[in-house]
């Protein structure tokens, strides 16, 4: 499979906003933010990052690939757990420095490595002047120990 090459973004704001060319604006580390939601019900599943190669693989294969900042490499989401993300639609924002993936999740229908459907399973609340986390989704679709051995 040939590697897609993205053209450099235009300095002209109107070209970024209105032209038909997809010219993603990667940050100084070569990454673009990816917001991921469920294609069916719109639930926010995760936020990740992509480099040019991960974005190209995602576009070419229809399966979500991301760049792991901690591991310093590309990973196909769900390759280990079986919870692959099939991309149904890709959108970009007005200045092309973020993308939005609408996906269908295979396997256990879980996106988070904790076994939950979404990585956003906690709310931030203020109790006695201290920010605290409250779990709002404790349902685990799989046991991470069984999948990752952690």
From Swiss-Prot:
Q: What are the binding positions for Mg(2+) in this chain?
A: 93, 95, 97
Query: What's the top EC group for this one?
Result: hydrolase
Give the NCBIfam families listed for this entry.
PRK00051.1
HAMAP family given for it? HisI (MF_01021)
Q: Which reaction does it catalyse?
A: 1-(5-phospho-beta-D-ribosyl)-5'-AMP + H2O = 1-(5-phospho-beta-D-ribosyl)-5-[(5-phospho-beta-D-ribosylamino)methylideneamino]imidazole-4-carboxamide
Name of the protein: Phosphoribosyl-AMP cyclohydrolase
Pathway per its UniProt entry is:
Amino-acid biosynthesis; L-histidine biosynthesis; L-histidine from 5-phospho-alpha-D-ribose 1-diphosphate: step 3/9
Query: What cofactors does this protein use?
Result: Mg(2+); Zn(2+)
Q: Which GO terms describe its cellular component?
A: cytoplasm
- What does it do? Catalyzes the hydrolysis of the adenine ring of phosphoribosyl-AMP.
- State where the protein is found: Cytoplasm
Subunit info here reads: Homodimer.
| Disulfide bridges in this chain | none
Q: Biological process GO terms, please?
A: L-histidine biosynthetic process
Keyword line? Amino-acid biosynthesis, Cytoplasm, Histidine biosynthesis, Hydrolase, Magnesium, Metal-binding, Zinc
The cross-references to SUPFAM superfamilies, in alphabetical order and at most eight, read: HisI-like
Q: EC? A: 3.5.4.19
């Amino acid at each position: 499979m040939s590697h897609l090459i993205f053209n450099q973004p235009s300095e002209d704001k109107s070209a970024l906003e209105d032209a038909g060319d997809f010219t993603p604006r990667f940050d100084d580390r070569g990454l673009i933010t990816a917001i991921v939601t469920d294609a069916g019900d719109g639930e926010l599943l995760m936020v990740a990052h992509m480099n040019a190669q991960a974005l190209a693989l995602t576009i070419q294969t229809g399966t979500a690939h991301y760049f792991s900042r901690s591991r310093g490499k590309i990973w196909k989401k769900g390759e280990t757990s079986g919870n692959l993300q099939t991309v149904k639609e890709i959108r970009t924002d007005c200045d092309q420095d973020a993308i939005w993936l609408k996906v269908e999740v295979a396997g256990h229908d879980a996106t988070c490595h904790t076994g939950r459907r979404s990585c956003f399973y906690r709310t931030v609340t203020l109790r006695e002047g201290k920010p605290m986390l409250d779990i709002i989704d404790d349902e685990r679709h799989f046991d991470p120990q069984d999948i990752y051995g952690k």
